[in-house]
Structure formats: C-alpha cells, structure tokens
Amino acid sequence: MTERVVLAYSGGLDTSVAIPYLAEQTGAEVIAVAVDVGQGGEDLDAIRQRALDCGAVESEVVDARDEFAAEYCLPAVRANSLYMDRYPLVSALSRPLIVKHLVAAARTHGGTIVSHGCTGKGNDQVRFEAGLGALAPDLRIVAPARDFAWTRDKAIAFAEEKGLPIDVTAKSPYSIDQNLWGRAVETGFLEDIWNPPIEDLYAYTADPAEPRDADEVVITFDAGNPVAIDGETVTPYQAIVELNRRAGAQGVGRLDMVEDRLVGIKSREVYEAPGAIALIAAHQELEAVTVERDLARFKRGVDQRWGELVYDGLWFSPLRAALDAFVNDAQQHVSGDVRLTLHGGRATVTGRRSEASLYDFGLATYDTGDTFDQSLAKGFVQLWGLPSKMSAARDARLGGAQS
C-alpha cells in the first residue's frame, strides 16, 4: 500500500514545491492540509485548489479560527502571556493547533508521515515536532527545507522545471507569518538591527504618529475571558477581530525587538498585535483590582513560565497543563469592565470596575471617610521589620555589619 504524507500547506512557493518533491523523495501520496487561523490574505479555496494542481491527492482547508481564538488565544490572555515581557506569542500559539489538525488528517487519510516547511534555524521546527511527538509519536517527520537543504533558488528552479502553477518571480524581502493574534516580520534589511523599520512593513496597524481622534473602548471580562465590547456580547473570535480593527487603527501593538530564540541565537523581529496587546493590558488591570496580593505576585511568575513553555514548543507538556489549571483557578474573580483609550500607539487604561473588586475606597482614601485604623500600623511595622533588626544587631555584635 502506498504511504501517505500529510503536509502543513500554506499555498506559498516552499510548500507548493514540497508536494511533488515529497512525492519524488518518499514515493508517498501527499495530503495537503491548510489550517485557517485567521491569517487572511488569499482565498483558502484557491489555496486548496493550488495544492491539487501541484499534485496533492487530497487537499483540506480547516476553518480553525474560532477554535484558535477560544482555546489558544484566550489562555494566553488569562496568563498575560508576553515572552520577554513584550512578545504575545503570535506564531507560537498557532503551531500546536496546526499540529492537532495535521494529526487528525493523518488519522483520517491513513498518513504515516507528516511534513512541514520549517528551516533548521527557527523555533517552529521544534514546535511542530515536539507537538507531533506528544500527539502521534508513531508518525515520521520530513522537513524538506531542513532535511534536503532546500533553498529558495532551488525551489524556484524546481517549480519551473515541473511547471507548477505558482508565481515564482515576485520575492518579498521579508519572511512574514500572520494570524488572528498578530503578524510577525523578519529577515531582509531588518537583520541589521540598527536599521529602523519602514512603514511598508506594517499591515495590521496604522502609523501611530498620524494625527487622529482617540478611541475609547470598554472591555467586559468574565472569569478572565472577554465577553463584551462596549456592552455588546462578543465571541472570543469577534473580540479579537474588533480589537485588531480598533486598536490597529490607532497604531497599537507595534513591537520591534531582538528576542532569544529557542535554538540559541538572537533574532530581530517586528510584530504587530493590536488586539492582543489591548486585551492583555485590560486583563492585567482587572487582575490588579480583583486578585489578592500574594496570589497576584505568584501568578506573575507562573505567567512568565507559561509563556516560555509555549514559545519553546511545549504546549502539550504536563507542566503547561498544570500551569493552566492554576491560572484558570486564579481567574474565578477576574470579572468586570476595563476602559481603554486607544491613541498614538498606546492602549491606556482609564477606568476599571468590578463587583469582585478588592479595592476599598474607605481603606484607600486619605480624605473624609477614611476607615483605615492607623493606630494598628505602628505595631505592624515593628513586627514586620523585626527579623532584619535582629539580624543587623547580630552582625554588628560580631563585627560583620551588612552594607
């Protein structure tokens, strides 16, 4: 029986060329699977047909936009996930979902091999293959760009030789990956980290320096999840789309950073994530109002580790699942409204309210109505500082005073 290889298909040059190339190299039939995670651009029906025209025996397009929003993006919101305190995991979040659907296609179509278009230099090869190893360790993996030393010139020559129905002349100077959660741009002149990004790089956000009226938006959360915008009920997908539109129009969510890749190198990336940045900013503020101090302090470390695990391709790890359980439990009171002003590239919190708020006006005010018993403070301060006081006295007695 002829083997079948399931290919993660994007419709571009590299994965289109991979169809006949994989067939030649492995002798297998190729099943192309394109997963819609809100990347937009070309019509997915056209992408499906292109895969067939390039030699795939089956071609599937999976609409995973709602699933991506609810089951991958919202956990990132609840975990305030910003890798290196900045990057909202635009690409990293989509990879485990794509892996899930590749495995499903392999089971449906009798596939024994899975293929992706990642190089040996990036993070995505790890994300794909760690996920495949967790979900389907029986499937073999082939990565043409890495395993067969694939280059763009080689891909173009192969496409022309085979007469493949793809445009092999236009060449973007950048490598671009985009989805519902944001857009990532790298390579080209950006590899010189002194070069500033040019406006042509951006597609999800308007120039924040352009004068325009501010936009005020109220986001309603229930147990850490956005459920309404300006009082109108929204699904997770609708919330992200709407905030991408409104925050993007104000230039919110542009990031230019040098990040630490999993493979050990530093890489310069330019990101656009207007909806993600707005949602995380609002969620962080609502947590500040509703989450008890020690829980909030501990959760910050959990949030950081959660983001590192996802960035490093360990979505399917037991630790990520356990951290999710902690994060979700911590969200039971994170319900209420946060008002943001979107303007000049910033999402600024200007108001917050919650029935579960731990903010007590009477305790916080310095004016009339103060209910804080200041007579209790003196003894508290003395007891709080007692260990340090005793340690300092001991050091002075022994001649080893601390600086």
Swiss-Prot record:
Keywords: Amino-acid biosynthesis, Arginine biosynthesis, ATP-binding, Cytoplasm, Ligase, Nucleotide-binding
Any one GO biological process: L-arginine biosynthetic process
PROSITE patterns recorded: ARGININOSUCCIN_SYN_1, ARGININOSUCCIN_SYN_2
Pfam families reported in the protein's UniProt record: Arginosuc_syn_C (PF20979), Arginosuc_synth (PF00764)
Reaction catalysis annotation: L-citrulline + L-aspartate + ATP = 2-(N(omega)-L-arginino)succinate + AMP + diphosphate + H(+)
Residues engaged in binding ATP: 8-16, 117
Coiled coil segments of this chain: none
Cellular component aspect of the GO annotation: cytoplasm
Gene3D superfamilies found in the cross-reference section: Argininosuccinate synthetase, chain A, domain 2, HUPs, Single helix bin
Binding residues for L-citrulline: 87, 123, 127, 175, 259, 271
Self-association state and partner proteins as the record states: Homotetramer.
Identification of the protein by name: Argininosuccinate synthase
